[in-house]
Amino acid sequence: MLTLPDFPLPDARGRFGPYGGRYVPETLIPALEELEAAYREAKKDPAFLEELDHYLRQFAGRPTPLYHAKRLSEYWGGAQVFLKREDLLHTGAHKINNTLGQALLARRMGKRRVIAETGAGQHGVSVATVAALFGLECVVYMGEEDVRRQALNVFRMKLLGAEVRPVAAGSRTLKDATNEAIRDWITNVRTTFYILGSVVGPHPYPMMVRDFQSVIGEEVKRQSLELFGRLPDALIAAVGGGSNAIGLFAPFAYLPEGRPKLIGVEAAGEGLSTGRHAASIGAGKRGVLHGSYMYLLYDHDGQITPAHSVSAGLDYPGVGPEHSYYADAGVAEYASVTDEEALEGFKLLARLEGIIPALESAHAIAYAAKVVPEMDKDQVVVINLSGRGDKDVTEVMRLLGGEL
């Protein structure tokens, strides 16, 4: 049966080394303490774990395959490439692993209203889905720019019974939607559960989201031993806030020996030198955003700079505290690829494997194109295919002018 692993970090104060913590208004501290206590209790409750396991299997469609991408492996001519097919989950992305867990926790705590922020709309759709499943009232905050880019997901959320509130402030993207969601939570904290979509925000969110997503890496461990009798040599995943990557990395990150190479791929947007990117680790500085100390993008005046990526799910101007810690401690390495490279990865996977990936996942494919050819043929690389690309096809068509 499913267990939620006990990792060595965060510490009792919710810190990963210097990162993480709880930088929030006093009014939210009791709510976060209540949430942490409820989560720690649920994590040890066999009935909660059994129910989560049931919904992950019967509703979401776990376990997902670890698929040998033979044509892609041949094309690159280096290591053998395996894809962790999170794109095959119900709702089309890894987000459902976390939203099911948090919705069950909300119900357990007696909260009948859930709120969420969303960028690409995948998390919003996922929250609207579990709210419908468990009969919860649902409000999703989404930046106006993302509402434009992801019209299909907006309609999906409404179809599932959620109220979508467009946010016109700031850059009108994920950061601004998150600000509004936090404001709502402060106002309605007694009745409302905030389902945060990534490994960001104040403690216990980075820990909780990681634990719910770690099913990805735990499955990869088991499947690797079954398929090729050992652990992979490298794991590659796209990093925005960082939940799909942490879900893959965490079960390997704390291994005393034999840890695969962990590679997180950030969005370089139009190039790191242009200022139009979302590479918080690659080009950011340490600071506090949305209740957590982590790597961020901000200017000389301390103002958060707008993140840019072709992928709506990666344009968050920060990266989770555990990734920030991994980067400093050398547990994982972080690279970045441009919009242009990601679009090439998007097309490549479609043509060689018959799989249209999400633009987020296409960043991981694009970086793999640089490292896999340099590896030996008997080595194994696992790429986390965090979501499917249906939601992105219209935007890609617009960007490429309909020309492939």
Curated annotation (Swiss-Prot):
Gene3D superfamilies: 3.40.50.1100. It is an enzyme of class 4 (lyase). GO terms for molecular function: tryptophan synthase activity. The keyword Lyase applies. Pathway: Amino-acid biosynthesis; L-tryptophan biosynthesis; L-tryptophan from chorismate: step 5/5. Tetramer of two alpha and two beta chains. NCBIfam families: trpB (TIGR00263). This is Tryptophan synthase beta chain. It comes from Thermus thermophilus (strain ATCC BAA-163 / DSM 7039 / HB27).
